Amino acid sequence: MKEKIAYLGMGIWGFCLASLLAHKGYRVVGWARNPELVAQLQTEHRHPQAPDMPIHPNLSFTTDMVEAVDGASMIVEAVSSAGIRPVSKQLKTITDLKVPFVITSKGIEQHTGLLLSEIVVEIFGSQASRYLGYLSGPSIAREVLKGCPCSVVISAYDPDTLKKIHHAFLTPKFRVYPNSDLKGVALGGALKNIIAIACGISDGFQFGDNAKSGLVTRGLHEIRKFATIMDCRPDTLYGLAGLGDLCTTCFSSLSRNTRFGKLIAQGFTLEQAKAEIGMVVEGAYTALSAYQIAKHHKIDMPITTGIYRVLYENLDIKEGIAALLQRNTKEEYL
């Protein structure tokens, strides 16, 4: 019998990785709350956001979480960062988490400032840490679905858990590199979305590639400072989970965070831009948490602060840009 993997969350990213695992020969059961989405997947055998990609026969769908996780040797999540707490609470009523649990979402919880892995540990208890894994890196879902080469990192606290997850996801075209700095991997994936919004704003004003490269470089500097204060390894941020993911998200026309920033530059409000994108914009969610944490720890993060103020304090976007451009320049160091 084929080894079973449960996949929680069937947005385009969840569908993408669930399809990858199905093609590797696993029996994958994808769970989603939305009964209409599940019915569409079951009857049309296409995902609405990837209608040109047929569903692999090893991949099935359900709205019943018990059915999804029963007998699974691994559980993978791809819900929004705002959704991981309620989904984890629901999962806790079903299992005590005795198999690898892989987080593939990117964000920081608002108001608590917790990483997604920390939310899971809070709900399941400290013993859950040994089963936690985190997959992150430059991975646009549509490119992965098409079979384009891609490199990501997987991190876990426990060596056996890391080995199992690494084996499950690795393919000749989906290159998976182990990394022991789980917190750094998580922060790199979360914070780069804020910088991507700034790059989208730059695109919206047609500031050009020079300006965008400056934002990416200074944005990486902000991310590194933040992660260092949070006891992460700085070198993690120069790898796939940091610089790699940052470049892809900031320069890809498929990035929803960059497209969101472009809409903000065009005069859309926060809610209008989110509605126009039609999918979760994690950078908008994370900007609030990152700003609050940076303020508490007195971390100077001018790009993050500017995005927060534009989105949540109604700062005029041109004033925000002017404030960034008028800052004193200091000796560059990374």
UniProtKB/Swiss-Prot annotation:
Stretches of the chain forming a coiled coil according to its record: none
SUPFAM superfamilies: 6-phosphogluconate dehydrogenase C-terminal domain-like, NAD(P)-binding Rossmann-fold domains
PROSITE patterns reported in the protein's UniProt record: NAD_G3PDH
Major place of residence: cytoplasm
Cellular compartments annotated: Cytoplasm
Catalytic EC class: oxidoreductase
GO biological process, one term: glycerophospholipid metabolic process
GO cellular component, as recorded: cytosol
EC assignment: 1.1.1.94
Name of protein: Glycerol-3-phosphate dehydrogenase [NAD(P)+]
Organism in which the protein naturally occurs: Chlamydia abortus (strain DSM 27085 / S26/3)
Gene name, Swiss-Prot/TrEMBL: gpsA
